[in-house]
A protein has these predicted regions:
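Low-complexity, Pro/Thr/Ser/Gly/Ala-rich linker/spacer regions in secreted
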Residues: 29-41, 390-402, 409, 496-519
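A recurrent domain-boundary module in secreted/ectodomain proteins
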Residues: 197-205, 370-395, 495-504
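Secretory targeting signatures
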Residues: 1-37, 418-420, 433, 479, ...
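Short, glycine-rich nucleotide/cofactor-binding loops
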Residues: 81-88, 276-283
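HKD-type phospholipase D/PLD-like phosphodiesterase module
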Residues: 29-74, 85-263, 290, 298-374
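Charged helix-capping and loop-helix junction motifs
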Residues: 284-290
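Glycan-association/targeting regions that enable binding to alpha-glucans and other polysaccharides
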Residues: 394-505
Length: 544
């Protein structure tokens, strides 16, 4: 029997239409409209994006204000802000300027509804922005204990993640004392789409600000303490190239992300965190602490910068018992250590808002990102090393030590520095550096003559060059300072000479596929249904 091709073609079209295929097919190969971000489930799963993208890094107090201003002023279409608190009047002034210069700019603001330290400032900002014509919402009070996240989405292609709020102590004026904070800017549509999906979900569940119900707060103040901090990291880092990017959110993936970082460490693990709490509660923080101790036990050199807050006595004792050095953030130049970051082997870095409390990890909304890129990680590592060298080391008998480079190779001379600033108010009689190569005997070197200026410009740092050692060698160092007949002996630390470090663990990865492959993935089931319908039609025609 001869089949009418016209009828067969019509049958195919009808089958495709029934299967829901024709309209998507037309859209796929026609002009693409601007992509609309879909409202997604609250379960934001772990995704790693392999991207070739641009990244900008900056820190507070050094260059944070200039960089944030630059990116906000660069917005052409939209700015969406999801943040715990705002008390910086200069940021509010900038938004007013943007409103005047770019009146069509789409801006939304999602603020923490019960943010500690920010209830009145947040109400004032919410009322001010509402009067300016922008929509403002509170995060849903039943979703999280605190909405402690700090991220910004610009033009649906750039995401900024902060450890700090939009506060005077996070984005200070020149010459003002402020917190140590890390921030990162990621320019990539796919990565930003992930953050936008979180924003859309939280925004959709948010509560509209109402001045009558919520109040109007108190005007923001411009006061701040002066500082002599020289801002050595005022220049932002600019990086472009391939990198793995993993967005991190509480309560969804924060614990997974923190443990991934710590468990990935093979040579060095550097952690900067405001505090530890929930110690001994058998919760998320205990898992983090256990992972840190396990890293030390498997041969990783661990450093921790924190503050004498919350469970600091407990964590100090735990770390001392396991040979892990901890310093307290310098407060001569900084108001506080408000950073929440991890650097692993100088090649992976976590920038986030996540504190080490069970609530922050499992009950808050928090936001961050893991970047696997050596250049980016090394930029933050330089700042960590700076903070390490000026930290209060009373937990280590007031004697601190470190070296450069962090992970030397077999061809690298190693410069070891003893930091004596805690004891410098008294004349030092002797500074000694103990060195043990591998499992050999200790050698002790007097370095009282090898003195140079500390970061604060005082003659209180002592150094010794160690010759290069074979790949795989572990060099143990221990600094000692004598004042009169009293010796102050620091903790032993291990320099790990490595020409290479093993690859990182594999994670669930999202990559970009070509248009045809993505089309087949999205619509393959409909194509199959259409083909089946055509075959059935042919069989039916033959039977007739």
């Amino acid at each position: 029997m001869t089949i009418d091709r016209t009828k067969l073609g019509s049958l195919l079209v009808v089958s495709l239409m029934i299967s829901g295929f024709v309209l998507p097919l037309a859209a796929s190969f026609g002009t693409q409209p601007t992509k609309t971000i879909e409202f997604v489930s609250s379960d934001f799963t772990w995704q790693t994006f392999n991207r070739n993208m641009n990244v900008t890094t900056f820190v507070s107090p050094d260059g944070s204000k200039d960089e944030l201003w630059h990116f906000l002023q660069s917005a052409e279409e939209s700015i969406y802000v999801e943040i715990y608190g705002v008390n910086n009047p200069y940021i509010l002034e900038l938004i007013h300027e943007l409103n005047a210069v770019k009146p069509t700019l789409d801006m939304k603001f999602l603020l923490g509804w019960n943010s500690l330290g920010y209830p009145n400032p947040n109400k004032y900002v919410a009322n001010n922005l509402t009067l300016l014509g922008y929509p403002v919402k509170w995060t849903n009070s039943s979703d999280f204990t605190y909405a402690h996240q700090k991220f910004v989405i610009i033009d649906n292609e750039t995401t900024i993640a902060h450890s700090g709020n939009w506060a005077k102590t996070s984005f200070p004026e020149d010459g003002k004392k402020a917190n140590r904070e890390w921030s990162i800017v990621m320019t990539d549509v796919e990565v930003t789409n992930y953050y936008r999906s979180v924003f859309d979900y939280d925004w959709g569940r948010g509560t509209d600000y109402d001045s009558g119900t919520h109040g109007t707060g108190d005007p923001l103040t411009f006061t701040g303490d002066n500082s002599t901090y020289p801002r050595p990291f005022a220049d932002a880092g600019e990086f472009s190239g391939p990198m793995n990017v993993t967005p991190i959110f509480s309560p969804d993936t924060s614990l997974q992300g923190i443990l991934y970082c710590i468990n990935s460490a093979q040579a060095t693990l550097d952690i900067q965190i405001p505090y530890f709490t929930s110690i001994g509660d058998a919760g998320a923080v205990d898992q983090v602490v256990d992972a840190i101790l396990a890293a030390k036990a498997r041969g990783v050199t661990v450093r921790v910068i924190s503050e004498e807050e919350k469970d600091w006595l407990e964590i100090e004792e735990i770390f001392q018992d396991h040979g892990i050095p901890i310093v307290w953030q310098d407060t001569r130049w900084f108001t506080a250590n408000h950073n929440k970051g991890i650097i692993v082997d100088g090649r992976l870095v976590l920038i986030s808002s996540i504190n080490y409390s069970d609530g922050s990890i499992t009950a808050n909304r928090e936001a961050g990102v893991i970047i696997e890129n050596e250049e980016v990680a090394q930029w933050y590592l330089d700042i960590f090393d700076f903070d390490w060298g000026i930290g209060d080391c009373d937990a280590m008998n007031e004697v601190n030590v470190y070296w450069s480079p962090n992970i030397p190779t077999s061809s690298t001379t190693i410069n070891v520095t003893v930091y004596a600033h805690m004891l410098n108010s008294t004349n030092l009689d002797e500074v000694s550096l103990g060195v043990r190569i591998g499992t050999g005997a200790w050698s002790n070197y007097s370095i009282i003559e090898h003195i140079h200026n500390s970061e604060e410009g005082d003659l209180e740092s002592y150094s010794r060059l160690l010759p290069a050692q074979a790949d795989g060698t572990n060099i143990t160092v221990q600094a000692s300072i004598r004042i009169g007949s009293t010796w102050y002996v620091g903790m032993e630390m291990v320099i790990r000479v490595r020409n290479s470090i093993g690859s990182l663990p594999t994670t669930t990865t999202t990559t970009t596929v070509d248009q045809l492959m993505q089309f087949l993935i999205d619509w393959g089931i409909y194509i199959a249904a259409a083909i089946a319908a055509v075959i059935l039609g042919i069989v039916f025609q033959r039977r007739r």
